[in-house]
Design a protein with these regions (language model features):
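C-terminal interaction modules
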Residues: 2, 6, 52-55, 77-81, ...
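Bacterial N-terminal signal peptides that target proteins for export
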Residues: 5, 19, 23-39
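Bacterial N-terminal signal peptides
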Residues: 38-47
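Short N-terminal segments immediately surrounding and downstream of signal-peptide cleavage
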Residues: 55-71
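N-terminal post-signal-peptidase region of extra-cytosolic proteins
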Residues: 72-88, 95-98, 159
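Glycine-centered loop/turn motifs
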Residues: 81-85, 89-91, 115, 195-197
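Short, small-residue-rich packing micro-motifs
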Residues: 92-155, 173-182
């Protein structure tokens, strides 16, 4: 039977020289070539698929103004700087005009400023005092809420933006957009929608609440300087419960929703909004939810 030459074949940029084969075997040659090429593609894809995913390590995104400080677990306090990596139980501080922005994981970020102090959990934070704004970047995973804790309440956000201000006299929560749930150690629960505010005036509380808070402060003071155990590496330390929480009720006040004019003004002058090189990721959502225009340049 006469033989025919098969034209040169291209495989991955290389040329296979012509080989004398029987006509009936031509299809077999092409099938083998296709199989080899396909196998190479599958092997390459499998290599890409099995690459392990690396979690984003917490880090400082920006420090537009000082004073700002960082204290890693077991280390002395140092000046905060952009790009610095952080660990669970790191203590962050700002004073006066100091401001910083921190990236946690899965799109969770926050800004703090003024006389503020905050401690990092693995994916949550504890605001010890001062002001902060926290959010989850649009499009990021919302499998778990971003929890911002204080000794008085925990704000849970899931694809939303919330502002907290915690002083010696009050705790104030402003939900900029979306839905925020606030839960207290005493079992009270509040849900805020876009523009709604919640406040706790510490001076107007009952004597029972004041005694409870003093006892809680005493417990916290005793814990200072004690390094966290290895078991505490993933989450913030549990809240102290000096009394049965069901017997202590705090008097919270739902404030009027923020007005359009007030919201517009705050977006234009707030250091936590305008005092950084870039706007927060959820600014357009805030403007849309509250019916606002873009802040003036």
């Amino acid at each position: 039977m006469p033989t025919r030459l098969v034209p040169p074949l291209s495989t991955g940029g290389r040329i296979l020289h012509s080989l004398p084969v029987l006509s009936k075997d031509c299809n077999h040659v092409f099938k083998q070539t296709d199989w080899v090429q396909g196998g190479g593609i599958l092997l390459l894809c499998s290599c890409l698929w099995v690459q392990p995913s690396h979690a984003v390590q917490p880090r400082i995104v920006e420090v537009p103004a000082g004073p700002a400080f960082v204290q890693l677990p077991g280390a002395p306090e140092i000046t905060a700087r952009s790009g610095q990596t952080l660990k669970t139980n790191s203590l962050l501080k700002t004073n006066k005009t100091g401001r910083m922005q921190v990236l946690l994981d899965n799109g969770r970020q926050f800004r703090m400023g003024g006389d503020a102090q905050l401690r990092l959990g693995s994916a949550n934070v504890e605001l010890l005092k001062g002001s902060m704004i926290g959010w989850i970047k649009p499009g990021a995973s919302r499998a778990k809420p971003f929890r911002i804790k204080t000794r008085l309440a925990t704000a849970s956000i899931q694809g939303t933006t919330v502002f907290l201000e915690y002083t010696d006299d009050q705790l104030k929560v402003l939900n900029w957009e979306g839905t925020v749930t606030c839960e207290t150690p005493t079992g009270q629960r509040y849900t805020l929608t876009s523009g709604q505010q919640l406040s706790l005036d510490l001076k107007s509380q009952s004597q029972e609440v004041k005694d409870y808070l003093e006892e809680l402060d005493s417990d916290i003071s005793e814990q200072k300087g004690v390094p966290p155990s290895p078991e505490a590496a993933e989450e913030l330390p549990p809240e102290s419960t000096p009394k049965k929480l069901s017997k202590v009720k705090m008097t919270w006040k739902s404030l009027n929703p923020i007005t359009v004019d007030e919201a517009q003004k705050r977006l234009e002058i707030s250091p936590l909004i305008t005092g950084f090189s870039k706007p927060i990721d959820t600014l357009s959502e805030i403007q849309r939810e509250l019916g606002l225009t873009a802040p003036s340049e």
